[in-house]
Amino acid sequence: MKVSIEGSVVEVESGASCRDVLKQALSGKKFKKVLAARCGGTMLDLTATVPTACETLEPVYADSPEGLGLIRHSAAHVMADAVQRLFPGVKVTIGPAIENGFYYDFDYERPFTADDLEAIEAEMDKIIKAAHPFERSVMSKDEAKKMFADMGETYKLELIDAVPDDIVSIYRSGDFVDLCRGPHIPDTGCINAFKLMSVAGAYWRGDEKNAMLSRVYGTAFPDEKELKSYLNRIEEAKKRDHRKLGTQLDLFSFQEEGGSGMVYWHPKGALVRAILEDFERKEHLKRGYQIVQTPQILRRELWEKSGHYDNYRENMYFTDIDEQPYGVKPMNCVAHMLIYKSRSHSYRDLPVRLFELGVVHRHEKSGVLHGLLRVRQFTQDDAHIICTPDQLESEIVGVLNFVRDVMGVFGFEYSMEVSTRPEKSIGSDEDWDRATSALVKALEGQGLPYEINEGDGAFYGPKIDVKLRDCLGREWQCATVQCDFTLPDRFDLVYIGQDGERHRPVMVHRVILGSVERFIGVLTEHFAGAFPTWLAPVQARLLTVTDAQNEFAEEARAALMAQGIRVEVDTRNEKLGYKVREAQLEKIPYILVIGDKEVEARGVNVRLRKGDNLGLKTLDEVVDIIRADCEEPFKSGGMRYSFS
């Protein structure tokens, strides 16, 4: 048979391996970078036989995303091998490749330590140098269960039972044996650069009722240069960790005695939040949204009607009031529909755009809670647009333009995904197809690139997920636009059309920032705590050299505050250098020094937090400088910053 490989047609003998065929078609230099093959969307080991129906055989290179995933998956096996060599009696569970590396979960008598990681790395080096080939074999489930039972690997027995087929695949590398679908790299020697990163606890299968395991995280790259670059980014990310900066800048805290996953906003953090929320309210009002406020709890029957009870119950909190069951809202859509239904609507009234900075509660397992990024109580900048089917595309486009303008203010680049129907969902196939088509049509009509994310939509409708990219190249999911034909039907939302008849509207669910808490966490890390001047809780601090300048410092503070500048005064009897350094550590944008010369000139010496010195300026000049700094981010979106 004949197979196409990178534009060349190769004659393939029956039973030939992918390795032999690719080696025949590629140059020696290119072939050295090949880790596996792909045929018809299926990845194959190089030792696998070329399928008889294969028309195109694609090499999978080490520097491709697929190749990187293979390296990391194989590195997880090498790590498990090393752990079994060093810690007799340890049981292995699962070890997949993940976004930035890999992990493996182990059941051992004690948690692993940092010293253990060093020993495991050293043992992995030995295994890699031995270049053990990864060898695939298949056997019946019964044979596999007997083999792993004899090895004492009880977790593997449970995994085998979950396999729907009668046959399972096994991979061997040296003396290590693992249950695995594969594929893998040719041999352990193909792992050129790796690093074990950390240890954490993880429940077996993510269930808190199961055994607590030790999860060892690692990463791997095609070469040392890429690994070093990644490790440098990790170190920078540690410096920017919003949890650390939240304490350093006195923005927020978490009080475990009050409950996990709940944020306590301190004055400066609450001010950042208030400024952000005020910005949101003004921008929504300018775009024709109406601000609403709705209750925290609603009768359970409403959540049953909406489908949340059947499809989202495990993420909700419930309580009884006067012997009536209630649910704490995880989303705002049901309450917004009740507002819409409280009065009749004509086609002339549509679209109706209801906006709420709504506090919601969602039960997240304690193991996934992470600072502001994953909490149990948070505020969504949530809006629901109820419109006619003819208005749907233009409303989606309006939301996408809103996202563009807001992300521009913060300087974020972003990408978009269309997330389609999940397995657990409500509504007809026809409605899902219509909704998905509307989202895709809006994106394509604006010439916006997107990817399809199969099966990740909300249970009531497909959505556009907007993923912003921070200064370290990390992606964060914030904004979403969801199209919903189902809930308007369940709640019998109607409008009177031009024909005088009742018609069913469509509903768009959307957030711009998403969770306000999460967005502030992302902002904190993106800016390393040095918020843009318009968002900084303290925009300027006046520092006196001696007590002789205290009176003028108070006059200057009053004058700046009168112009809408958020300013503090530091008149402590400390050395000026100490006070300047402290202000820089607190990331205050403008440090205004007052000595005798400044008092005489009725001005201040202006220093920036990054160290630049603008020299002596009058107070009016300082106001102009700070205002210009505040206004700059808003220019690209045609927006204006308000000092009110």
Curated annotation (Swiss-Prot):
Keywords: Aminoacyl-tRNA synthetase, ATP-binding, Cytoplasm, Ligase, Metal-binding, Nucleotide-binding, Protein biosynthesis, RNA-binding, tRNA-binding, Zinc. It catalyses: tRNA(Thr) + L-threonine + ATP = L-threonyl-tRNA(Thr) + AMP + diphosphate + H(+). Zn(2+) binds at residues 333, 384, 509. Binds 1 zinc ion per subunit. One of its GO terms (molecular function) is threonine-tRNA ligase activity. Its EC number is 6.1.1.3. It is found in: Cytoplasm. One of its GO terms (biological process) is threonyl-tRNA aminoacylation. GO terms for cellular component: cytosol. Its cofactor is Zn(2+). Residues 1-61 form the TGS domain. It is an enzyme of class 6 (ligase). SUPFAM superfamilies: Class II aaRS ABD-related, Class II aaRS and biotin synthetases, ThrRS/AlaRS common domain. Residues 241-532 are annotated as: Catalytic. Pfam families: HGTP_anticodon, tRNA-synt_2b, tRNA_SAD. Homodimer. HAMAP family: Thr_tRNA_synth. Catalyzes the attachment of threonine to tRNA(Thr) in a two-step reaction: L-threonine is first activated by ATP to form Thr-AMP and then transferred to the acceptor end of tRNA(Thr). Also edits incorrectly charged L-seryl-tRNA(Thr). Belongs to the class-II aminoacyl-tRNA synthetase family. This is Threonine--tRNA ligase. It comes from Oleidesulfovibrio alaskensis (strain ATCC BAA-1058 / DSM 17464 / G20) (Desulfovibrio alaskensis). The gene is thrS.
